[in-house]
Amino acid sequence: MWRRTYLLLLLVRVYFALSPSYLHPDENFQGPELFAGRTLSYPSKLPWEFTSENPIRSVFPLWPVYSLPMGLLKWFYVELEIGNPSPEVAYYSLRAVMFLLSFVLEDWAIYELVPLPRHRRAAVVLVASSYVTWTYQTHTFSNSLETLLVTWGLVLIRRIAGQKRRSSVFSCVVLALITVAGVFNRITFPAFLLIPGLQLLPHFWRRPTSLFVFVLWGLFFSCTAIIIDTRFYRPSASVLDALRSPIITPLNNLLYNTKTSNLALHGLHPHYQHFLINLPQLLGPAFVAMILSLWNRPAIPSWLKTTQAVSALSGTAMLSVFPHQEPRFLIPCVPLLLSCFRLRKSRLFIVAWVIFNVALGFLMGVYHQGGVVPVQLAIPNIISANTLKSNKSLENQPRVSATVLWWKTYSPPSWLLGNNTNFPLDIDTRDLMGIPGAEMAQELEQLVPPCSSHSGTHMDDASAGSGRADRTNFVLVVAPRSATYLDQYTTAAAGSSGLELQELYSYPQHINMDDLDVGTDGLLATLKRVFGRRGLNVWLARRAGCD
């Protein structure tokens, strides 16, 4: 029975891995965006973490996960002589890589961490049925990589500590690599392994060789990571230059995050946010069951004494010191806590668990900013389909320039636009984020040309004659359907505003959770607007009355 359940959950994980939801900008801009430009020559816009004077992100742990698959994909296409892989193929290839890493490494680690066979099956199924495993863990997050590194770090700590007669040299080397990769991936990594790592002290005391190997290889991998990062950020630097004047990204990251003024730019939260808000959001009914187990028993429950629980709770406590606290920072806690907690057979819990994860799975795995990636992939085709001449020929087609305004969405990844080698097209993407509607309208007023300039109208209009063949400048607006401010430009009375929006494309599976204005509209009206008007639209902006 458990095998059939696990296989079914595996198919569910595949479905969500290939669903283009968008959980946080970091999943694109701190990984794929970086390497797509260098490996596949796609347009890319690097975030400040990689462009500041003191960069805080390392490429050392990212290269094998993102650059290597992209490089292999490019090599495969070159060998077949079929050009460059499309952004869509590259995007879903990376999702497939993350799925495989989750399926193989995460599930394997859980199997290793749970000692009793009957508990292993329940733990693996429980972790596999979590919406966090379906969504966050199959997306290109550094937090997802951190989960794999933390779980395997605990596996190796257990293996090394359990060896009484041998030095476990190979395990120490691998643990050194995992430790260095974890620290260079995210500076939060040591918080999860610091307390469990104390188990190694007796072994290191009995077997000094293990300690020597761990430290020596740790230094080697650290130097390697520093050299790779330094030469990435300063390509002209030699190995000696990198050693003399190194760029140590984890140190830069730590110095940045210890300043409250820097964290305030990203949002400050109360110190109890992780324990009282983020963990319940990630664990749902399992969190309630864990609290009840503490309440109902006078002694400390056995699950609370496990290595997984110690790692998760000590890590959460250490991360709670910092005032910037997002749920994704606790992704490693989910498999750790679910694998150590022993649930009694309860129909109420099973029903609540299924409802919670199905609801959050579809919300976060399908609808959450779900239109950004498909629309960005479709933008070149949308523009080309609406600018070709009536004979649909690419010959003598003037070069097209398009300004695309993204409003009330997450930042669109530039690399998903691809090379546009099949159509003479220049795309200027502008991220307006969540600016007020009046400011967005002012931006449109400045960009949309008057009727006399013969711009902003697609070439397929029946009135587009030979004298208007030079219409090559277009302004598009991409915004959620729930943005009611745009209704004044899309209705029949749009002419009174001087601008009108003509719908060109719509992607229905999109919900903007950052547009919940409960204070102004009220709860029910807000939910009706955001969930009732699902979808992400692409509009052509032009002057009203232009034919």
Curated annotation (Swiss-Prot):
GO terms for cellular component: endoplasmic reticulum membrane. One of its GO terms (biological process) is GPI anchor biosynthetic process. The chain crosses the membrane at residues 5-25, 58-78, 96-116, 175-195, 208-228, 348-368. It is an enzyme of class 2 (transferase). One of its GO terms (molecular function) is alpha-1,2-mannosyltransferase activity. It is a multi-pass membrane protein. Keywords: Endoplasmic reticulum, Glycoprotein, Glycosyltransferase, GPI-anchor biosynthesis, Membrane, Transferase, Transmembrane, Transmembrane helix. Signal peptide: none annotated. It comes from the Eukaryota. InterPro entries: GPI_mannosylTrfase. Its EC number is 2.4.1.-. Glycans are attached at N391, N419. Pfam families: Glyco_transf_22 (PF03901). It is found in: Endoplasmic reticulum membrane. Pathway: Glycolipid biosynthesis; glycosylphosphatidylinositol-anchor biosynthesis. Alpha-1,2-mannosyltransferase involved in glycosylphosphatidylinositol-anchor biosynthesis. Transfers a fourth mannose to trimannosyl-GPIs during GPI precursor assembly. The presence of a fourth mannose in GPI is essential in fungi. Belongs to the glycosyltransferase 22 family. PIGZ subfamily. This is GPI mannosyltransferase 4. It comes from Aspergillus fumigatus (strain ATCC MYA-4609 / CBS 101355 / FGSC A1100 / Af293) (Neosartorya fumigata). The lineage of its organism: Eukaryota, Fungi, Dikarya, Ascomycota, Pezizomycotina. The gene is smp3.
